[in-house]
Swiss-Prot record:
Start and end residues of each SH3 domain: 229-288
Spans through the membrane: 21-41, 45-65, 71-91, 104-124
Cleavable signal peptide: none
Assembly and binders: Forms homooligomers.
Region listing for Disordered, in residue ranges: 151-228
Protein name (record): High osmolarity signaling protein sho1
GO annotation, cellular component aspect: plasma membrane
Localization terms from the record: Cell membrane
Extracellular topology ranges: 42-44, 92-103
């Protein structure tokens, strides 16, 4: 199971707001139910609504904290739909009672039902839905909000990359395994042409110092030009661990912002905020 991180909730306004409101609504319903029960006349069935709603809120907090909504979205919608029915029945019983405490409990259930409806609409929609892209653009990085609807057109030379809410990272191969399968057009930052070019041996590195077999007679290594400009910005939609056998690759975490020098090919030359440079798989990134 994915690791729970409080930053996933605190850094996502939608998760933070909806979870906070649901907790507040549940507390109103719970405390009012206790008061009503002390004076008698509280429907026994509504206690099940209180318990079930508590489980739903805890479950949603775990989903937001572990960022696994795309994995369990079908189960989430099912459980929330059942919770909506249960709370609605309790609302119909409590709001018409003469007791002020019962009406307060009904108000808490109404607020909770509103949050559940929003959750169902969010998790029950397809990943490419416009409202999901708008809501997700505010998560963690404010840069994403500006890119919504105004981002640069993305290259489709190798097909569409996976949606940002895909449950599984795309199948990837190491940069060495892709020799001969990448674009044959020149790419800035690649010595001797694009990766896989016939004019370059598979053992020649794409970045950094050349191998000893390519040294001139005087023993001084050739200078490999590095990109000086990174005009593009990209956001990581998955975490990626660099292949230890390829020193040119860089690791990055989900939602991390990278600067990119060129967006052609399956591997992009990127620079992290720390200044570390290297290549990153293009279908793990989305342009801002």
């Amino acid at each position: 199971m994915a690791r729970f991180r409080a930053s996933n909730i605190l850094g996502d306004p939608f998760a933070l707001a909806s979870t906070s409101i649901s907790i507040l609504a549940w507390l109103i319903a719970f405390i009012s139910s206790i008061v009503t029960g002390v004076h008698g006349g509280y429907p026994t069935y509504s206690w099940w609504a209180v318990a079930y709603s508590f489980c739903c809120i805890v479950g949603m907090a775990l989903v937001f904290g572990t960022d696994t909504g795309a994995v369990y979205n079908i189960a989430i919608v099912g459980y929330l739909s059942a919770g909506l029915v249960i709370t609605t029945i309790s609302i119909n019983t409590l709001v018409y009672a003469n007791s002020a405490a019962s009406q307060a409990a009904g108000a808490g259930f109404i607020l909770l039902a509103m949050v559940i409806i929003i959750w169902i609409f969010y998790f029950g929609s397809s990943p490419q839905a416009s409202h999901r892209g708008f809501i997700d653009s505010f998560a963690l990085q404010k840069e994403g909000a500006g890119s919504y609807g105004n981002g640069r057109p993305m290259s489709t030379a190798f097909g569409n990359r996976p949606e940002t809410t895909s449950s599984q990272p795309p199948q990837m191969y190491t940069s060495a395994q892709l020799n001969g399968f990448e674009t044959s057009s020149p790419v800035s930052g690649y010595p001797g042409g694009a990766p896989g070019s016939e004019h370059r041996s598979s053992s020649q590195p794409r970045f950094g110092n050349p191998s000893a077999t390519n040294l001139p007679n005087n023993g001084a290594p050739d200078e490999v030009p590095q990109p000086t400009e990174y005009p593009y910005r990209a956001k990581a939609i998955y975490s990626y661990e660099a292949n230890p056998e390829d020193a040119n690759e860089i690791s990055f975490t989900k939602h991390e912002i990278l600067e990119v020098s060129d967006v052609s090919g399956r591997w992009w030359q990127a620079r992290k905020a720390t200044g570390e440079t290297g290549i990153a798989p293009s279908n793990y990134l989305i342009l801002l």
